[in-house]
Amino acid sequence: MLALAASSALAQTRVVSQPAADSAASAAPSQSPAATAPAAAAAPVSLSARKVYEQARPSLVQIRTVLKGGPSQTSVGSGFLVTAQGHIVTNFHVVSEAALKPERHDLVYVTADGREAPLVILQLDVLHDLALLRAGDALAPLAASAAGAGASAAGATTSVKATSVKATSSKVGANAAAASSAAPRGFEPLAFRPASQPLAQGERIYSLGNPLDVGFTITQGTYNGLVRRSFYPQIFFGGALSAGMSGGPALDDEGHVVGINVARRVDGEQVSFLVPAEFAIGLLARGKDAAPIIGPAYGIVDEQLQQHQAALTDRFIAQGWKEATHPRYRVPVPPDVFMRCWGTSEVSRTGGLDFERSECQMDTRIFVGEYTTGTISLRHESYDGSKLGPLRFAARYSQSFRNESFIRLPAQHQTKPRCNEDFVDRDGLPLRAVVCMRAYKKLPQLYDVSVLVATLDQPESGVQGRFDAQGVSFGNAQKLAQHYLDAFRWVR
């Protein structure tokens, strides 16, 4: 999955470890055209799409992260106005550089008709990748433009009320006449689709934003329900999204906001994702009267990640393990509630080592500036070395164990791993186990934990397993490691 903010060079892509049959890029603030497949060409814009775009155009903004003291931008994304007081919704990953390094970056918005002014950050929802901003220059002008500019523009019929957005806000279509580039209008806030009107499978929706910094656009697609196995709800949007559209609105036929652009798959066509509008509504309610965030927002990020890791640990442990599939051992494999598992096998044709591999990962990862966290993955490999003999098998088996690395992030983000190795007994099954932990330097209460396990009872066969949890507390790291180790047993 690739987040859709675009960097100035469009040249950075971060790819996570992937199942062989279902690879995906992780959330990242930028996209490399050379490294990822281009989005599928959008279908011709319908008359309905034109109507929706013309109604929404005065509410759209491009959000630029710029270096302090200079005009150079480091990333761009999209956003949209949600109140006449100048509140703007976008993605956290769009503004993360300014949120985490405010001493180096500023935020500005650019409207569809070219106006540019500064922004301030009021509230963050890191877990759902949302941010609430406010136009730092324009509280009075925004209210005035929403109340008066629309009525004075050519073709305008009514003004938009300057009220806070709620789930039951009146629809946009009746209150916003079509705008045109020849007669630009003032900002007009978008309304959210009422919660009493849930989307139906196959319903047409429209995504708006500024892809690749080339200009505002609209893409048409369909609502395909919520994404399966996502830890937090996300909408599966059957339409094309491109880098730079992150944070833009997704609208229904009436111009109501139903979601916020957030990511797309790079290994498929028109497989895109939206944050459901309900989370933006909640963010607005919590943050519309908040003072601007001053200084790096790591404290806010840390607090929200603490909530996430607690919920993740509880849910992961509560779900238990699948029934054993290995003929000799009970090997920990999670159910596919919020993880997906893939398997491969390789039979040596030269009398070497045969093995089977299973790998399970969460699709959900929490974006934190230059890296992601808040996820769990695990795998196991079953080895058959009967063609090698005990000595050669022992050498290959031990080498595979030693090949594992426990360094994930650069030194500026995380400490070196500290590991303990021991030989343990699980219900009579001898195991070699290594537990490693790494601390986050700017998120001081969070750790990554890795557990590496190898069975030792057979001279020509065995199972090796690895468990990784990112962004958990020290106590939960210990709890998860023990939960994983306890799952290795004999099959009886």
Question: PLM features: what roles do these ranges have?
Answer:
Residues 1-8:
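Bacterial N-terminal signal peptides
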Residues 14-78, 290-344:
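N-terminal activation segment of mature serine protease catalytic domains
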Residues 52, 98-99, 120-122, 138-152, ...:
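Active-site substrate-binding loop(s) of clan PA
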Residues 56-72, 136-148, 181-191, 214-285, ...:
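Active-site region of chymotrypsin-like
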Residues 83-130, 137-138, 174-179:
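Catalytic-histidine neighborhood of serine endopeptidases
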Residues 281, 291, 337-339, 459-492:
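Surface-exposed amphipathic alpha-helical segments
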Residues 339-394:
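Secretory pathway targeting signatures of secreted, lumenal, and periplasmic proteins
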Residues 395-456:
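Signature of long, low-cysteine stretches enriched in small and polar/charged residues
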